[in-house]
Curated annotation (Swiss-Prot):
GO cellular component: cytosol
InterPro entries noted in UniProt: Aldolase_TIM, TIM_sf, TrioseP_Isoase_bac/euk, Triosephosphate_isomerase, Triosephosphate_isomerase_AS
Protein name: Triosephosphate isomerase
Binding annotation for substrate: N9, W10, K11, G173, S213, G234, G235
Amino acid sequence: MRKPIIAGNWKMHKTLAEAVQFVEDVKGHVPPADEVISVVCAPFLFLDRLVQAADGTDLKIGAQTMHFADQGAYTGEVSPVMLKDLGVTYVILGHSERRQMFAETDETVNKKVLAAFTRGLIPIICCGESLEEREAGQTNAVVASQVEKALAGLTPEQVKQAVIAYEPIWAIGTGKSSTPEDANSVCGHIRSVVSRLFGPEAAEAIRIQYGGSVKPDNIRDFLAQQQIDGPLVGGASLEPASFLQLVEAGRHE
């Protein structure tokens, strides 16, 4: 039985004071980690303080991206070594906003995934199709290609620890959402791709999230689907009460 994982992606929101207050408000109320994994992925500048604030609790702190190199002349970048040193646990890789706005490619994402495992970070690897690709009937082909390239070079044991987040680009921050059944179908296809590449044990163990306008009022519909192990949530993760509703929903699935 795969443990649900509820991850919030704050994107470029909050001040340091607001971020710390959020963690103080929720850390004592998240469900036990043996029931559901609760993650907040915050801006780089806040990570050190948030890891300290969440220390000793069941709330995990993640980053929203990273570079693939341990160090070097990469102005403005943050390395996996730096994140690990801070005590960060998870890192989102290949989010569509990174691909679209910052020219990240499948090959770059793969380098980051390999680097994350090398340094003991758990990657949340994003994939998803555009509206045009969806309307052309290319959803399964697009996500299969992204997943295959992102996981290249990993071992089955590493794949078992990874998280894949299916986020259809047309549903991110738009208020539109894939139906739970459609999302489940794509997540099932992703699992079949993992099975083909790494075997059925890895496919059964890997956790696959759905992201795209998930909120407290619809999360249970997605969690009820067999292939969906939790959501990657944007806007609905910004308020403590909303985030706690999300993780509590995961506790009962």
